[in-house]
Amino acid sequence: NPDEKLMLVVEGLIKEGFEDIIIVNDGSDEAHMQPFKEAAAHKEVTILTHEVNKGKGRALKTAYEYCIANRPDIDGVVTVDGDNQHRPADIRKCCEKMIDNPDYVVLGCRDFSGENVPAKSRFGNNVTKGVFRFACGIKISDTQTGLRAIPAKYLDFMSRIKGERFE
């Protein structure tokens, strides 16, 4: 369920020049609809709705499928969580890197070295990045980032990955 941070994300993206913002309402209840109503008032925003919560994985797939069907000429998509943890300028940088490198998925990464980072978050990220490196042979500093720039040619594949909840 979103809060006022969703509008901070939307307004930041619009100020940064993004003109096609897709938001998935993943089964939010009536008490949490105001942020979606406010976002929908912007011409740059399209709201896609799940009547019941289906999970982050399904929400992402819904957006990918929408883009495949309705935005065939895009370079790709940038996924951003609705909690305003990513700066619009960093979102733009990821988008530009993806456009410059259309064979690669670009991941934003958070700084886990600060004193304000909960030990649980730091530990969880260290475990998952170690598992990812062991399983895939690739070093990624933030495996749980919500900031991803994905070239359009990978959207069909991404929409068919097994799992719906963001396993």
Regions found by a protein language model. Name each.
Residues 37-71:
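Conserved donor nucleotide-binding strand/loop of the catalytic core
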Residues 92-117:
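Conserved donor NDP-sugar-binding/catalytic core segment of glycosyltransferases
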Residues 1-15, 31:
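Short, well-formed alpha-helical segments that are part of the catalytic scaffolds
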Residues 25-34, 84:
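A conserved acidic beta->alpha catalytic loop
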Residues 1, 26-28, 54, 63:
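Conserved short acidic donor-positioning loop in nucleotide-sugar-dependent glycosyltransferases
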Residues 10, 18-28, 48-50:
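Short beta-strand/loop segment that forms part of the nucleotide-sugar
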Residues 71-85:
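Short beta-strand-to-loop acidic/aromatic patch adjacent to the donor-nucleotide binding site
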Residues 60, 72, 117-167:
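Conserved catalytic loops of nucleotide-sugar-dependent glycosyltransferases that act on lipid-linked
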